[in-house]
Amino acid sequence: MEKLLDRIDSPADLKKLQVSELTKLAEEIRQEMITVLSKCGGHLGPNLGVVELTLALHYVFDVPRDHFVFDVSHQAYVHKLITGRKNRFHTIRQHGGISGFMSREESEYDCYGAGHAGTALSAALGMAVARDRRGGKEHVIALCGDAAFTCGITFEALNNVASTTQRLIVILNDNEWSIDKNVGAIASYFNKIVTNPAYSYLRDRVEKVLEKWPGKNVLKVARKAEEAFKSLLWPSVIFEELGLTYHGPIDGHDIARLISTFEFLKNQEYPVLLHVITQKGRGFPPALEKQKKFHGLGPYNPITGETPSSPRKTFSEVFAETMIKLADMNRNVVAITAAMPNGTALDKFQPKFPDRYFDVGIAEEHAVIFAAGMATKGFKPYCAIYSTFLQRAYDPIIHDVCLQKLPVVFCLDRGGLSGDDGPTHHGLFDVAYLRTVPNITIMHPKDEDELADMLFTAMHHPGPVAIRYPRGSGSGVAVKERPELIPIGRAEVIKHGRDVAIFSLGIMVEMGKELAQKLEECGYSAALINPRTVKPFDRGTLEFFARSVDLIVSIEDHVLAGGFGSLILEELQALGLRIPVVRIGWPDKFIEHGKVDILRKKYGITVENALEQSLKILKHPKSDTNLEIA
């Protein structure tokens, strides 16, 4: 029997279906996502929750003429399935396949790329104003999760809507979750709207009465009646005060009602906000039971939802376990996260120290300034934020923390290549954007045990500290029961050598070990150095080896521009030393999504490439090369 989904290659095909057929199509799409993502992983829960909403939008509006701007856009899988990418859906988040986020390069239906939260409303407003200025008629719809409303950028845009356009539709997709349960006053406010029994009762009664009225204007009357009752109960609805007409909340899984609502809203000449209630993980019991886990995950059993376990602890888990130890040692230690307790593993810290744990929502700037404020009163804030998200707080890092020399510890999870999530999530710029800032100490551990030592050392340091560590599991080394202090600004010489000095940053020490072995097999004695701290840098160790070897190799999981290798070149220049330098790192481009090993091979972040480049110089020291020369 042919599936309805088999007939959908574009939104035009979707419009050929009867409204009554869309429920069956929704079921087929859910099953397709459950099956495909069980093999490759992805953001399953959020996408299961927006099936009906996405179908209704495409049924009423006309993309690519009209524009759907998804906040974060990790919930755009259904959109991709019905906009010509169905036959490539099995490649999602795989190298060479379609992205797990909206991508302007991928499809004309993706009007705006994203990956971080809070951008949709600003972008949609910009599109709407551009449309107005050229006299266009297309619709612009911003799809924002409720978590996006904990992000200050969203409210900056809301503050600007009424004064700049009269035609904009904002959809608030309310499932009470981002990656973790939403927090703060905004989340409580949404819940108050949804659960107000008087409002729900009156709304339902009015609808039942009006359903019996004849005439074409009944829908308009119904809407006005609903708004009248709402205004009685909610005289100061925040969105109304900001100039958007509020509609809802409505059931985000009722396709017929969604379609009728969109048909009504598309004809209105005022900015509107539609509050839609959806269920994250709908249609897959394991995803409903464990919404946090199924927000985004790797391969899983499509029947039970079980995922394979790793025998090794992740760096995030070691971070959380160490934080618990530090909190036991020092009552002034506090932990701060920006809506990522699960991703940073601070959900393990929270039950033990609930009064010393703070989830501030998707608000990285606020998180950093909040930490700075606590630091002025003697507390030791550890601010755990993904490397890619800390970019959003660059000004507070400089202005509020480093300028005042406050002892805030930035714990940069996902430092380095992130993998399947792609360019919006790789943490490849942090060394470059942090090492230019005065007063900050930057550390990068080679393994799990050294991470624990660095966290402990940071507790005793009187100024700002950034500790960068990667996603996923480490090498499996044992972590000491009690961490130890490490000397800030002093490198660890793992192995001495006469011909080559390999400076490997962080987890790239493992690659450095392999390179040293390969060079030894080729007859060259190689030293291996673990820098430990990028800032302050151990210039003395660099000078010692620069005066005694024929080649320096730097290896980093970071862009070359402004990164660790650049630092080595700068230091050699300052020392007045000339020596060939081979730099291994990421090129000056945004790195696509894919498995880490595949991407490293493609871009030459391999032992083989490092060996080849090194031997070119060692065998022909006087020849011209394209390698970096200090």
Swiss-Prot record:
InterPro entries with a match to the protein in the record: Dxylulose-5-P_synthase (IPR005477), THDP-binding (IPR029061), Transketo_C/PFOR_II (IPR009014), Transketolase-like_Pyr-bd (IPR005475), Transketolase_BS (IPR020826), Transketolase_C (IPR033248), Transketolase_CS (IPR049557)
Cofactor(s) demanded: Mg(2+); thiamine diphosphate
Pfam families documented for this protein: DXP_synthase_N (PF13292), Transket_pyr (PF02779), Transketolase_C (PF02780)
Co-factor binding comment: Binds 1 Mg(2+) ion per subunit.
Keywords: Isoprene biosynthesis, Magnesium, Metal-binding, Thiamine biosynthesis, Thiamine pyrophosphate, Transferase
Gene3D superfamilies from the UniProt entry: 3.40.50.920, 3.40.50.970
Catalytically driven reaction(s): D-glyceraldehyde 3-phosphate + pyruvate + H(+) = 1-deoxy-D-xylulose 5-phosphate + CO2
UniProt-recorded name of the protein: 1-deoxy-D-xylulose-5-phosphate synthase
Pathway the protein acts in: Metabolic intermediate biosynthesis; 1-deoxy-D-xylulose 5-phosphate biosynthesis; 1-deoxy-D-xylulose 5-phosphate from D-glyceraldehyde 3-phosphate and pyruvate: step 1/1
Top EC category: transferase
GO biological process, one term: isopentenyl diphosphate biosynthetic process, methylerythritol 4-phosphate pathway
Gene Ontology cellular component list: cytosol
Domain of life: Bacteria
E.C. designation(s): 2.2.1.7
The family this protein is said to belong to: Belongs to the transketolase family. DXPS subfamily.
Protein role: Catalyzes the acyloin condensation reaction between C atoms 2 and 3 of pyruvate and glyceraldehyde 3-phosphate to yield 1-deoxy-D-xylulose-5-phosphate (DXP).
Binding-site residues for thiamine diphosphate, renumbered to this chain: H74, G115, H116, A117, A147, A148, N175, F284, E364
Annotated residues for binding of Mg(2+): D146, N175
Taxonomic source organism: Methylacidiphilum infernorum (isolate V4)
Transmembrane regions: none
Record text on subunit structure and interactions: Homodimer.
Keyword Transferase: yes
GO-annotated molecular function: 1-deoxy-D-xylulose-5-phosphate synthase activity; magnesium ion binding; thiamine pyrophosphate binding
